[in-house]
Swiss-Prot record:
Gene3D superfamilies: Aldolase class I (3.20.20.70). GO terms for cellular component: cytoplasm. This is Phospho-2-dehydro-3-deoxyheptonate aldolase AMT16. The keyword Thylakoid does not apply. Nonribosomal peptide synthetase; part of the gene clusters that mediate the biosynthesis of AM-toxins, host-selective toxins (HSTs) causing Alternaria blotch on apple, a worldwide distributed disease. AM-toxins are cyclic depsipeptides containing the 3 residues 2-hydroxy-isovaleric acid (2-HIV), dehydroalanine, L-alanine which are common for all 3 AM-toxins I to III. The fourth precursor is L-alpha-amino-methoxyphenyl-valeric acid (L-Amv) for AM-toxin I, L-alpha-amino-phenyl-valeric acid (L-Apv) for AM-toxin II, and L-alpha-amino-hydroxyphenyl-valeric acid (L-Ahv) for AM-toxin III. NCBIfam families: aroFGH, PRK12755.1. Gene clusters encoding host-selective toxins (HSTs) are localized on conditionally dispensable chromosomes (CDCs), also called supernumerary chromosomes, where they are present in multiple copies. The CDCs are not essential for saprophytic growth but controls host-selective pathogenicity. The gene is AMT16. It is an enzyme of class 2 (transferase). Transmembrane segments: none annotated. InterPro entries: Aldolase_TIM, DAHP1/KDSA, DAHP_synth_1. It comes from Alternaria alternata.
Amino acid sequence: MSFHVNNKAVGDPLNSEDWRIKGYNPLTPPNLLQSEIPQTAKSRDTVFKAREEVIAIFQNKDAQKRLLVVIGPCSIHDPLAALEYCDRLMKLKEKYQDDLLIVMRSYLEKPRTTIGWKGLINDPDIDNSFKINKGLRISRQLFADLTEKGMPLASEMLDTISPQFLADMFSVGVIGARTTESQLHRELASGLSFPVGFKNGTDGTLDVAIDAIDSAKYPHHFLSVTKPGVVAIVGTIGNHDCFIILRGGRKGTNYDAKSIKEAREKLESEGMNPRLMIDCSHGNSEKNHMNQPKVVHAVAEQIEAGETAVIGVMIESNLKAGTQKVPKEGKAGLEYGMSITDACIDWKTTETVLAELAGAVAKRRTLLGQNGTY
C-alpha cells in the first residue's frame, strides 16, 4: 500500500512516537461522501419505519406481536451478490410481514480473533491494498441501493468513525461479543440513533452485556470526528433502546428454555426490559452453520409454546451454503454467493427457517390471544 504521507521515522526506535507507523493517507470527510451518495426519500422512509418497528417490538407494542429476524451474510464482500440476496429476501419479507420483521444482516467490518480479511470497508479488493476510501464509497452506495429497495439493514459497530459515513442507513446496530465489554463501544452505543443489541461475552456470561446496556443508557463523551472530518469530542444523551443477544460461548449454548428463563429473570432483577434476541450462529451453533436450523427449530418451539421474552433471532445466511478461502488469484476466483468469513446456510434452508419462524409466531399470537395474555 502506498501512502500520501510517508513516515520518515518508521523503523527507528530512537523516535519517541510513530516509529511503527509506515505512513498516512487522507480520509474522505463523511459529509462529502454523503453528498456524493445522498440518501433518497425512499431510503430514509425504509430506515425510519424499521427503527420504529424494532423499538415497538422491543417494548411489546407491536400490534402483530412479530418477531425481529436479522438475517443475511456473515459479511458482505460482493455487492452484486448482496443485491441479489436482497431481492430474494424482499419477497419473503413481504410474504411474512404479519409475523416477521425481516432486517438484512449487512456487516461490512469483521472483528478478527487474530488476523484475516477485515471487511469490505477495510479491504474492498480483498488483496491487502486497504483502499478504505474506496471501501466506504462502495459500502455507502450498496446501502443506499438496499434501502431504496425497501430493505432495512443491521450492522455491527466496530469503531467511532465509520458510523459517521453510514449510520443514517442503519435500523439496528450490534455490538459483538469481543467488544461488548469495551468502554468505547458502550459510549458509541449511547449516541447511536437506532436500537443496539449487545451480545453476551465470549465466555457465555450475561453480566458484561447487562453492564453494557446499563452504561449505554447514560450520556457519555468520547473522541470521534464531525461530518466535515474534524477530530472532535462527542457528547451523547444515552440510548434506552438497547437489548441483549444470546449467542452462546465457551461454556456452551444458551438458546434453550432454561437459559432464556435465566436471562429473563436476570434482566428483571436488574430492572431491565426482559426482552432478548437469540443468535442462531456462533456459540449457539457451535460454529457449525448446519446447526443453525436446529437452533431455529428449538427457538420456534419455545415461541409457539408462548415464550414472549424472545423478540428476535439472528441468522447467518447466503445464496450458497458454507464458506470459502480466498484463492491465489484473489476475488476473481471466488465462488459467487458464498461467504469468505463464517459459513452460512443456503437460500433453500433460509426459506425453510423463515417459514418455521413465521408459523411459530402465528401460533403464539393465537395461543396468547386466547389466554388473554396479549
